[in-house]
Regions:
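Conserved phosphate/anionic-ligand binding catalytic regions in large, soluble enzymes, centered on
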Residues: 26-50, 217-223, 227, 259-260, ...
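FAD-binding subdomain of flavoenzyme oxidoreductases
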Residues: 1-73, 297-304, 309-334
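A glycine-rich phosphate-binding loop feature that marks nucleotide/adenosyl-phosphate handling sites
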Residues: 6-21, 86-102, 150-167, 216-229, ...
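Ferredoxin-type iron-sulfur electron-transfer modules and their immediate structural context
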Residues: 179, 254-259, 266-401, 420-421, ...
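Short glycine/threonine-rich loop-to-helix capping motif typified by GTGT followed
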Residues: 95-109, 159-168, 225-241, 269-282, ...
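Iron-sulfur cluster-binding electron-transfer modules in prokaryotic oxidoreductases
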Residues: 293, 300, 315, 419-503, ...
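Glycine-biased, low-complexity coil/linker segments
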Residues: 511-512
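Terminal amphipathic helices with adjacent charged low-complexity linkers/tails
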Residues: 46-51, 71-74, 78-179, 183, ...
Length: 760
């Protein structure tokens, strides 16, 4: 019975491993425990076997028009003895291409394949691997398998391929709307020889239920992770899931396969074990479980005696969440609740590297992870927490340590945007509980800066002396170790307007007057005059003017209000919307003419691109967003179009670059690194660090100071200290530069200043 019922395939982890005990003793009980999913006993120590790492590897990426051709080709590729074959369909590929974090890794793709097979080979030499990959390529062509085969031995190129494969699952879950690719039949395994027919039959079942599926997995061993797209928020969706699962279990049984080739039975697949193994073997499973665990304490309800699939659902037919009015546009996710529900619980936000999630990295507390906050919001919205929780102090405490870095927006494979959710939460919270004075002050930092500049240098003395510091601590709760930026008497606006007189002053970065380079086409740009550039750091604006004019461009200074970022961060969405409308009114005429808006401060300029279309929701906002660029981004756009000639000398400089979190989330770091490398004498390195920990006003607030500095100590501060003083630190964000100075004692300058140093 066991020999007849157990699948004769490479991958089978369903049920208990009774087939390992058909021969006479001695028995190796390890084989019984492995795969038992904690239902039999607790493992306290393990002795494992190690195998040598391969000397070298190479990849062949075979492109197909559809998933069926890819599945059919597997048996012919196995003849070439690859170390592995991975399969990905167009759902994974297209989401990877659209992903901010993964889009740059897609250079290995030719055309728009419906599916690819990633074939890996081990070897001892380049020649051996070249021979293996070329033979496969020739064989694929002779058999008309696929339309392209890309071979690669370069490690970086291979890493790009594996990055796409690794993040495939999360990207699939980033599908917007209630229907998601769900893992209720996603671990089937069959003989690779039969994979082509199996995939066709699987697809027929799914399409007969008026839906589709996403495919990826380990094709070389016949284990496919196929996820039908289903919504479980209505009964017909739950019924569809049950019907598909029932038919797929029949299909797997017919093909002599296993419902689980890798992930185990758990709750989802355990319910089918009596059907798959028969009542006699299922009874043996129950007896085995009872012998090891007579009291049923060890992970109950898994493998055997499993509850029905439609119990214990995160969402179900009785799930509901209110349609909460919002200031930002959540229509891409249906509504606010839909954006919260984008979190599928994978927990990638609990990583210890990257930008996401700085508060979790520093606290190691689930509550302060993206997943923890999303779960609390979902529970509050759906009524699982007491009424009024959405505007409660307790939920505010959970949201408070979110630094609004947007790291989750790009690094969470599901695209959870906790910063956006926090903005809306704070808006609702303030409406119910009032707006604290400190929030009002920080949100309106632009107005404060106007008066600070008019009264400079007296204003600087007032805020830096002991009395001023004490007042800022008592009234605004600013930590005593934080230094506010100094105000300047001559604002950037005053300096810029003075250039229109008979003897206009040059930028201190200009060398010998304006550059002679020309730009084909539009020769005018609008420089966004942000708050900090205008009232605190006009040298950044002067550097930007020098660079843009050296590139042959005429610079016009914007007459805009504050971008609204401080208001958004503090949840004052009405105030932010008013500023957005005003700025769009002022800049739309330029956008209509194709005159670019250039920004130097990432948090300001990227507000135009990210939040403005969501706040104002009209075509003018979209037009302004499309017409707005960071200065490095714009320079490289000209460079790539062959329109930039910048006279940069051979000044030698070592530059260490730290990117702003919003920059990393919205546009990446490639343009900044490329812009700095325009200077031929510059040696440039990117700091591999996450959030700096300052996050605007967050790090100034006394209750956040320790956490802010701890985040900086995770990677940024040590990376800077590890470099000699002859390395200059370049940072785009104003709060990031302040954090670098406070944490390391090193002065950081803006990218525009550092690059302008090289102007001839």
């Amino acid at each position: 019975e066991i020999e007849a019922r157990y699948p004769n395939i490479m991958r089978r982890v369903s049920g208990y491993n009774l087939d390992e005990f058909l021969t006479d003793s001695p028995f190796n009980m390890t084989k019984m425990i492995v795969g038992s999913e904690g239902t039999l006993c607790v493992v306290t120590e393990v002795k494992i076997n190690l195998v040598p790492r391969p000397t070298m590897t190479a990849l062949s990426v075979v492109h197909f028009q559809d998933i069926f051709g890819a599945a059919e080709a597997v048996k012919d590729i196995l003849v070439h003895d690859p170390s592995s074959i991975e399969i990905m369909d167009n759902n994974v590929l297209e989401r990877s291409r659209a992903s901010t974090g993964l889009g740059s890794n897609m250079a290995f793709i030719e055309g728009t394949p419906g599916a690819i097979l990633v074939v890996e080979f081990y070897g001892e030499s380049e020649a051996e691997l070249t021979d293996k990959t070329n033979k496969l390529k020739d064989d694929m062509a002779s058999r008309s398998h696929g339309y392209a085969c890309v071979n690669m031995q370069d490690r970086a190129a291979q890493a790009s391929v594996w990055a796409v494969r690794k993040n495939g699952l999360g990207l699939l879950m980033s599908m917007h709307g209630d229907a998601k690719p769900l893992p209720f039949v996603e671990d089937t395994a069959v003989d690779p020889e039969n994979m082509g027919d199996f995939v066709r039959r699987f697809d027929e079942i799914v399409r007969n239920h008026d839906t589709e599926a996403a495919y990826y997995g380990h094709a070389s061993v016949g284990c496919l992770h196929i996820r039908p797209v289903v919504s479980l928020k209505k009964q017909d969706g739950v019924d569809k899931m049950l019907s598909i699962a029932d038919e797929i279990s029949d299909l797997v049984k017919k093909f002599g396969g296993s419902l689980s080739g890798e992930h185990g039975d758990g709750i989802v697949r355990g319910v089918w074990n009596k059907k798959m193994f028969g009542p006699d073997i299922y009874k043996l499973f129950q007896e085995l479980k009872g012998t090891f665990d007579p009291d049923g304490l060890m992970n109950p309800g898994k493998i055997i005696d499993t509850p029905p699939m439609d119990q214990n659902l995160r969402y179900g037919a009785d799930y509901s969440a209110p349609d909460m009015p919002t200031k930002l546009d959540f229509s891409i996710d249906t509504d606010f609740a839909g954006a919260v529900e984008m979190c599928n619980g994978m927990g990638a936000c609990r990583q210890h590297v990257g930008t996401m999630c700085p508060s979790y990295v520093a606290t190691r507390d689930e509550e302060h992870s993206t997943r923890g906050r999303a779960n609390l919001l979902r529970a509050a919205l759906s009524g699982k927490l007491p009424e009024g929780t959405m505007t409660s102090k307790r939920l505010w405490e959970a949201m408070d340590l979110c630094l609004e870095c947007k790291g989750c927006k790009s690094e969470c494979e599901s695209g959870v945007d906790m910063a956006k959710l926090k903005y809306e939460f704070l808006d609702q919270y303030h409406r119910a509980n009032g707006v604290p004075l400190r929030n009002r002050v920080f949100a309106n930092i632009n107005r404060l800066s106007v008066w600070g500049s008019r009264m400079a240098p007296l204003s600087n003395l007032m805020v830096s002396n002991p009395v001023g510091k004490m007042l800022s601590q008592m009234v605004l709760g600013i930590h005593p170790k934080r230094k506010p930026p100094k105000f300047v008497r001559q604002t950037f606006t005053k300096w810029f307007k003075s250039r229109q007189g008979p003897n206009p002053p040059e930028s201190p970065f200009s060398k010998g007057g304006l550059g002679t380079a020309t730009v084909v086409g539009t020769d005018t740009v609008v420089l966004l005059n942000d708050t900090y550039m205008n009232y605190n750091y006009p040298e950044i604006g002067k550097a930007a003017v020098a660079l843009l004019e050296a590139a042959g461009l005429k610079v016009v200074l914007s007459d805009t209000k504050c971008c609204g970022r401080p208001m958004i961060s503090k949840g004052l969405m009405d105030d932010a919307t008013a500023n957005a409308v005003s700025n769009i009114d002022q800049l739309y005429a330029y956008a209509e003419q194709g005159i670019p808006v250039i920004g130097c401060e990432p948090s300001c300029l990227l507000t135009f691109k990210d939040e403005y279309p969501q706040l104002v929701r009209d075509e003018r906002a979209n037009k302004v967003a499309e017409n707005s660029y960071m200065i490095d981004e714009f320079l490289m756009k000209l460079q790539e179009g062959g329109k930039l000639e910048l006279a940069l000398g051979k000044l030698e400089k070592k530059v260490l670059f730290q990117a702003h979190c919003h920059q990393k989330a919205e546009m990446g770091t490639a343009t900044s690194m490329a812009a700095l490398r325009l200077a031929p004498g510059y040696q440039v390195e990117l700091i591999n660090a996450g959030c700096c920990g300052m996050a605007g006003s967050f790090g100034y607030e006394k209750e956040h100071y320790d956490l802010s500095m701890k985040i900086g100590e995770e990677a940024l501060f040590p990376a800077i200290r590890a470099k000699d003083e002859d390395w200059e630190v370049a940072v785009m964000g104003v709060s990031c530069r302040q954090q670098v100075e406070d944490g390391t004692g090193r002065r950081a300058r803006h990218l525009a200043e550092v690059l302008a140093d090289a102007l001839e």
